[in-house]
Amino acid sequence: MLDTLRHVIEAHGGLENWNQHNALSVDLVIGGMLWGLKGQAGKLERTTVTVGLGKEWASHQPFGPDNRRTRFSPDRVAIEDAHGKVIEELAAPRASFAGHALETPWTEPQLAYFAGYAMWTYLNLPFLALHEGVEVEELPIWHENGEAWRPLRLTFSDTIATHSKVQTIYAGDDGLLRRHDYAVEIAGDSPAAHYLGKYVTVDGIKFPTERRVYVAGPDGKPMPDLMTVSIDLSNYRFV
């Protein structure tokens, strides 16, 4: 394991502690310009997500009206009513985004797919870097906000549903993640600069309670007037 990655893993609570758990739930308040662009404003404004830790799956509830919920896995996504009856489903969901740009509207199953893989990725980091389908490379020091951050480039195998094959996470001197860069492949490879902070500790594991995602310019700097997603997270609990 790279020394920087080891420092990051320990700063977030350690692998031994993390491996004691199988799933995680957290309450979300979600905003940003993305949802309106996709024709899905308000569907996930206030919701709870539960994700697998390691195995890739996720569920949001409520999802829109009537306390509906989603079921996400890389090869299938479904929307269910409050009693578990399937209302709509989509197999091989990623293929349905062919030709999409940032402004292309999404169907509800497409929204559920995006939200599912995104939150699974976010909540499993940085431990996801140790997944057998992820390769890690250390990059040169990155200076931002008067700090020197240590970047790690993550290259994902095709078996993992996530934003893009190559992503970068940045850790501060304390080992906690500050930033996460990726291109949203299913939205025309839109480049994103994702900032996270205001950490809390839950059963020995550190989690951010604030996430802000901006369109990234050609120089890698965020465009502050183009905040695509905001997420406030509370009431983390292992389940």
Identify the residue ranges that each predicted region occupies.
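Flexible, processing/modification-adjacent segments and terminal tails
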Residues: 3, 81-160, 187
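N-terminal mature ectodomain segment of secretory-pathway/periplasmic proteins
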Residues: 3, 10, 15-89, 138
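Intrinsically disordered terminal and processing segments
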Residues: 15, 65, 127-139, 223-239
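Tryptophan-centered motif/residue detector
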Residues: 18-19, 35-37, 122, 178, ...
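Short, solvent-exposed secondary-structure boundary motifs
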Residues: 33-44, 55-64, 120-135, 156-162, ...
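Short flexible/disordered coil segments
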Residues: 56-57, 78-98, 193, 198-212
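Catalytic loop of the DD-peptidase/beta-lactamase superfamily, centered on the K-T-G motif
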Residues: 62, 66-107, 216, 221-236
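Gly/Pro-enriched, hydrophobic low-complexity segments
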Residues: 146-239
